[in-house]
Amino acid sequence: MSRRKFLQFGGAAAMTVLLPASGLLSGCSADQVTETLDNMGVKSGLDATFRGTREFTDSWGRTRTIPTVDKLERVYFTSALAQIFVFTLAPQLLGGTGMQFTPQELKYLPAGTENLVYMGSLSGGGEIDREMLLKQDIQLVIDCSGTTLSASDVSTAQKLEDQTGIPTLCIDGSFDNIRTAYQLLGEILGAEERAGKISEYLERVYNDVTAATAGIPDSEKVRLYYAEGPLGLQTEPDRGLHALTFDVAGANNVAAVEETQGIGMTNVSLETVLAWDPEVIIAWDDVIRGGADEIIRTDAKWSHISAVKNGRVYTMPNAPYAWCDRPPGVNRFLGIQWIANMLYPD
C-alpha cells in the first residue's frame, strides 16, 4: 500500500454508587444518607459522593477532593495547552479563557468562546487573575505539561491552589503520554466516551504515519528547515519540544543547534541556513503570527536556497492553533499528517 494511501488526511474516574433497590435509603437527605452509612460502618468515601465531591489522584500522585461530574460546572486551566484539552472534551465547562482569540480563530472554536472572560495564563511566565478565578466560581483548575511533568510544574500549580483554595490537578500532557492524559481528563470532566475516541484517533494517526515513513533511509529523508519569527531566522533543533511534529512525520530537520529552553526559537544566521540548504521550508504566516513566509519567498537573499528555488516554502496553518508546535497539544496531530503528505506525496 502506498504512503499516500496511509496518510490520507481526515480533517482534523467518575465514581458510580450502586445502592440496593430496597427502600432503605429512599426519601433521605444527603446528611441522612451519610449518617445512615456511618451507622452501617461504611467509610469508603460514599458520603463525599452524596455531598457532590470525590477524590481524584493526578499524574504526580497528588490526591485532591474535586466535584463529582454532575456537580462540575466551571473549570479553568493554567495554560493554552490545558485549555485545548478542555476545548476538545467538554467546552461547556470552560469557566474563562487563557487566550485572546482573533475573529479568524474563533470561526473554528465552540460557539460562545468569544464571550469567555479572559483570566490569563501561567505559560511563559504569565499570570492568572486569582481574584477573577474566585469571582467566576471556578471549581477546578487543570494544569497540563507539554513535556514530562516535573516538580517545577507541580510547584507552580500548588502555589496557585494555595492562593485560591481551588483544587488544581497536574496532568502529564507530553507527546508520549497524550492519550493517557485524554483518558484521565475524560474521567475528570465526565467525557470518557469522547476521550476514548480522541485517544483512538491519535494512536491511529501516529501508527499510520510512522509506519508509512519508517522505511525511508535517513539519507533520503527530505531536508526541512522550520523558519520561526519575523525574519525566519529562529528555529527548533531535531528532537526539540517544538520540532517533534517534523520528526514524527519523517523529516530530516537540518537545524543542528542547541534548543533554547522554555519558549524555544533558537537564533540562527541566514548564512547558516544557506549552508544547510533545506529542500523544504515551513514558515510562520505574516498575517496571524507575524512570520516570514513572504519574505522567504520574495527576498533575493533567500533565493539561492533549494526550497525557495523549487517553490517548496510552505506556510504553516495557524487557526485556531498552530498545527505543528504551539501549544504542544493535540493540534500537532493535524500537523503530522499535513507534513508527511507534503514531504512524501507518493
What is each stretch, according to the model?
Residues 48, 53, 155-232, 317-346:
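Extracytoplasmic substrate-binding proteins
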Residues 254-256, 263-290:
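Ligand-binding pocket segment of bilobal, Venus flytrap-like solute-binding proteins
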Residues 239-264:
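Alpha-helical, coiled-coil/dimerization segments enriched in small aliphatic residues
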Residues 2-20, 28-84, 193-226, 342, ...:
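Bacterial Sec-exported substrate-binding components of ABC uptake systems
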Residues 81-136, 140-151, 254:
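A short, structured surface patch at a secondary-structure boundary
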Residues 61-62, 119-129, 259-270:
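Short helix-initiation/N-cap motifs at beta->coil->alpha
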Residues 126-137, 184, 267-277:
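Short helices/loops that flank or line small-molecule/ion binding pockets
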